[in-house]
Amino acid sequence: LFSLVLAG
């Protein structure tokens, strides 16, 4: 889920 934020 928050992996997208980390990849951002």
From Swiss-Prot:
Under the GO molecular function aspect, what terms does this record hold? pheromone activity
Keywords per UniProt: Pheromone
Q: State its role.
A: Involved in the conjugative transfer of the hemolysin plasmid pAD1.
Quote the protein name from its UniProt record: Sex pheromone CAD1
**Top-level taxonomy:** Bacteria, Bacillati, Bacillota, Bacilli, Lactobacillales
